[in-house]
């Protein structure tokens, strides 16, 4: 099975995302009303300081369209993961930051949709923004994407930082879903300031 590299932040399994300076807006505005399984919660009900912008519910992602299974803008996690996220968000707020979520629970249908996209070599419309320095065939082979995700268990999130005062993204030297060596947390391809920002997470 093919696997990908995920940056995991401590016990909370926070997948670090490198956010650029684009404004943090919800990707999709239709309310999400899934059948909530026992042990899962909406993140905004537990951690109100967390700001959500589900990229896979819209078009600003490496596939270039909403993924199967995403129908709204409310993030879902297992209860314990959401409670851990609440503690992290409160600590960051005291430092002048907000925690922004790009992805949380990911339906398995979305994972299958990503695999389907990966098999279509002709679909290269998002290459210049999301994987400019690698061939699409290596997106899976170089471990950027995998055919199983901890997101589907509701215990992982893609996150970045926002300034609490303005709501603007903190400069991480990249953007969410940038499939590139520079996205590695400790990459030397970004500036020292951008690396310091990453280390906050």
Question: Could you tell me what each predicted segment is?
Answer:
Residues 6-16:
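Bacterial N-terminal signal peptides
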Residues 1-4:
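Positively charged n-region of N-terminal signal peptides that target proteins for export
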Residues 18-104, 108-201:
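Extracytoplasmic cell-surface/polysaccharide-interacting catalytic and binding patches
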């Amino acid at each position: 099975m093919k696997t990908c590299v995920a940056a995991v932040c401590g016990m909370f399994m926070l997948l670090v995302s490198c956010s650029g300076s684009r404004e943090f807006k919800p990707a999709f505005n239709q309310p999400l009303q899934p059948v909530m399984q026992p042990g899962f919660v909406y993140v905004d009900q537990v951690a109100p300081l967390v700001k959500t912008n589900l990229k896979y519910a819209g078009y600003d992602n490496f596939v270039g369209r909403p993924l199967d299974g995403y129908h709204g803008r409310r993030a879902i996690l297992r209860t314990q993961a959401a409670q851990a996220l609440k503690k992290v968000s409160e600590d960051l707020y005291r430092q002048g930051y907000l925690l922004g979520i790009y992805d949380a629970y990911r339906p398995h249908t979305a994972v299958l949709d990503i695999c389907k996209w990966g098999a279509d070599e002709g679909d290269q419309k998002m290459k210049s923004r999301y994987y400019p320095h690698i061939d699409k065939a290596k997106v899976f082979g170089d471990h950027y994407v995998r055919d199983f995700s901890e997101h589907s268990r509701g215990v992982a999130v893609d996150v970045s930082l926002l300034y609490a005062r303005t709501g603007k993204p903190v400069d991480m030297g990249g953007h969410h879903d940038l499939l590139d060596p520079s996205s590695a947390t400790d990459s030397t391809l970004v500036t020292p300031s951008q690396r310091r920002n990453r280390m906050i997470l």
